[in-house]
């Protein structure tokens, strides 16, 4: 039955439903029979509703003439599942049915959507990932193991992978366990044909083996555990077995293994015997690690830097900027920055030890990350020669290293906590009692041996120069001055014991000093030069005039900066001023936020330098 004819019949008499139609309303009997409600099935009713979907008023009138059960059957057929709307009345059901019929053409019934989803699921392929949670690389259909993290021989991976225990092919990128490569002779490790090289187990091409050997020796040299030392030496000896070109390296390995076996027995059973012993407790531990160092140096002489894995990185220049009794300031620079990212330096590790000590601690004193190049090492002993080793490193590992020697200044004071002043040997600096003859006759001796201990550069200050400095101090201390209407706060210092009398007669006296008398003395103390101080004062004054800081902060800041600021604080202030010079508002906020706490704390400079006439002392 055509939908158009049904629509025309319904519009002819809107009060007559399909069940009330008689034969007089139609011209042909076929149309009469098909319009009767008993003859129309669910699919024909759906076609009729879809034909009237563009005419919602006529469709609503037609649906109102049908029973609730007939409408429910059409809704269930449209949705593709059985539903029971017991709580909805007939008008609401008609509204839901019209909404279902008026859906866009792309939205078919739920059954159609379900079938399309099943087809999509069947079309989606599954991706096989590596079982290693740290890798999770996608594997091909023909891959039996992950070439990214698994061994190409045993096809297993390590949960905590140590790259020094793996052999990697430069051609195909495959890798294998070092132990797996040593078990089979067909990979060429220790053969006469390949001296210092090995065959890749995956592609068969030969690769360098000395880089892996150097890693074993380096770990053995730096480790503190006996089990690690034994294991790495055993691997280093196996990697060079049968060699003729590197016979001297093998002899050093044999000697180290022989000495170690004298303490722990055969290396095959070291794990059960020694467990996790300490290398320093072995009688041969230090000597064995020295042999490892000699083996690494011998390899560097034989193999060119391009062939060695630990090729030297950028050239370093290490110089000592300031030496005091208990600290030293070191600057490390890279002269020739490397263009390749592989050898690009990330930072430097500083290891400081006494020259008489044979070995350096495995933990560095400090680490300097670029672009920072200056570092201070604290806690040194006065009048002692030290050896400083600087090692450059990047993400791959250590690159280059350099050593120099220096000697700290003498500290004649009784208190070990005070640092040495660069102008006098006394621990109390220029604040010591000038009436004592010992203070007037002290000489300054400053020595530093640079460049691997080749030469000692010694500077001497005569007694006359020191005496002139003390004479200037006497003139300064007799005068008192006020800073912006307020007296300078008296800062008590530690006591000096008078050495001329038995029983230690201790005297203290208070004094106040003018800041305008000798500004250059304080400038030498905290590292603020005349030009730098003038530039900072002008900048702070400009900040006050533009309203970025108030008068109170300006007074406190300039007093603190010129009298109590340390070398590091002075350097930070200079960096802030140079960086935020074009943005004075940000500069003012940064200075207030960074130095407010330091300004309020009434401490003196902690760099060991006591400015003349500034550190006030009481004498009884």
From Swiss-Prot:
Its main location: nucleus. Residues 411-466 are annotated as: Disordered. It is found in: Nucleus; Nucleus speckle. A motif (Nuclear localization signal) lies at residues 213-220, 493-500. It comes from the Eukaryota. Residues 314-412 form the Fibronectin type-III domain. Residues 418-435 have a biased composition (Polar residues). This is Protein VERNALIZATION INSENSITIVE 3. It comes from Arabidopsis thaliana. The lineage of its organism: Eukaryota, Viridiplantae, Streptophyta, Embryophyta, Tracheophyta.
